[in-house]
Amino acid sequence: MNTFLLDYHAILTPKKGFPALFKDYTSEGEARNRLISGCFHLDYLNESDYYRQLRQLESRPFDRELLATILRRQNTRYGCTELHLREIEKLRSPRCMTIVTGQQPGLFTGPLYTIYKALTAVVFAERQKTLFPEYDFVPLFWLEGEDHDYEESAHTAVFSAGGIMHFRPEPFRRMPDQMVAATCFGEDIRRIVADFLDQLQETGNKPLIASMLGDCCFPGNTLEMSFAQLMMHLFKNQPIVLLSSQDPDFKKLSRPVFLRELSTCPASSYNIIAQSSTLENLGYSAQSKPRAVNLFHINHHGQRQKIEYPEDNRFVITPDNIHLSRHQILELCQDHPERFSPNVALRPIVQDTLLPSFACIAGPGEISYLAQFRRNYEQFGLTMPFVIPRGSFTLVEPKFSRFMDKMLRISGKSGFSRKQIYHAFFSDLQTLKRNAERVGENPELDSLFFSIRDRIEKALKDLGPVLAKIDPTLEPMLAASTLQAMKTVDTIEQKARKAGRRKNEELIEQILKTETAFFPEGVPQERLINVFYYLNKYGMELIDTLKNLLAGHSTEAHLIVEL
């Protein structure tokens, strides 16, 4: 299995590639140094920060017993193994830290990067255990089931004969803005599962996949529960623990953070605006727009409702138009913390207040978000955890590996490597396409066939006087032969040019197919395609293979894997 590392700065396809902030964060140099010092607390390249973070977390109070109890109950429901329960038990010790990642639940686990996040958390935790054997590090996946964007969450896609096939089941009696965790599958989930399986090749792995999907995706089950159950199936041999934040007991743990946000708002908003200004002064764009109150209210239908702050000490829950004083909303939160949900700005604060978060595994967009939250962490008396880039892959199937071999031969450049071909594909695909369009063209053909016709005509013309002396009646035959010779040359030229065009068209078609495989619908493969497409073709052990590859490489570069 060949692997190639590509620097994120070199990836400009599709569109503009990765965000500038992320590219600087994963590189070295003055731009990175300014970014770290201005927007983060810890630098994962600085060894002394690791010891500082360990000491700081070890001395902080956490309700580890309740946390372990919640996790044990939740993960048992998800179908965990003894391996996962042993990981949970470690959290009762003050010398145990979490490596946190997370994602909103996706249909059939959603896009590939969800799997890559979980694998990166496992690998990073194991690496820290090797470096600091006196501590334990538990990889933890935060289920963002409180997200209310069902259309985005309940979606997945795979490659099909006609291009890309999308799947999105209809929910059962879903209310507007209802949390994903409270949204159940309707009857059509059975059809969606069947249609999804129809798009997978017949392999020895397909019956197992069909069984997994059938067991986890059925009418009445929630998207969050099915996601968690599938993740447990896929990671049964990996020590990752799942956490659902909408658990009522976990909400009780979250209550102090909610109360502080409500009692001090709009302070969080001002902090994020000030930090965003720092970010923009460094040359980056702010990704998150804070609200005056960075909490939602959850009604009895499981709908997330905005909490507005139109004037001092007055709150309005919309769209129900419920007016509350600060005292009233604080009292509501004190009695019913399960009715509140953090937004994107407050969620990391909740996470790192309640969990001994040594590090969080984040994608390119998430790192850009987190860069806006440093001052808000300080507002809540917290140190940001290490922010580790998640693993990023492009999986290359054998037919596309063979095409890369062909591109290497066509390039005609001695010493040109496979990595350079991939570099060209990811850095400047349009130029590669333009060059391919000229492959079938041969500018030498024009001059070559002109020369051949000229030589034939001259040779036969020189033969004319000789034939006339021998027998004048041979001259018409010579003229006919000259015409026939020219027609033969014309036929050869036409066939040569047709073959060139065919070669050109085949090459362009192969480039377009490869582009679809690497950048389906113009986005990176990892952001759209479902993992079961690859597990079906290459085996369930692909999860372990990718984990081992991550263990041997840095996540500061994109990893191309030839399957």
Swiss-Prot record:
<dbReference type="Pfam" id="PF10079">
    <property type="entry name" value="Rossmann-like_BshC"/>
</dbReference>
<comment type="similarity">
    <text>Belongs to the BshC family.</text>
</comment>
<dbReference type="InterPro" id="IPR011199">
    <property type="entry name" value="Bacillithiol_biosynth_BshC"/>
</dbReference>
<keyword id="KW-0436">Ligase</keyword>
<protein>
    <recommendedName>
        <fullName>Putative cysteine ligase BshC</fullName>
        <ecNumber>6.-.-.-</ecNumber>
    </recommendedName>
</protein>
<dbReference type="InterPro" id="IPR055398">
    <property type="entry name" value="Rossmann-like_BshC"/>
</dbReference>
<dbReference type="InterPro" id="IPR055399">
    <property type="entry name" value="CC_BshC"/>
</dbReference>
<dbReference type="Pfam" id="PF24850">
    <property type="entry name" value="CC_BshC"/>
</dbReference>
<dbReference type="GO" id="GO:0016874">
    <property type="term" value="F:ligase activity"/>
</dbReference>
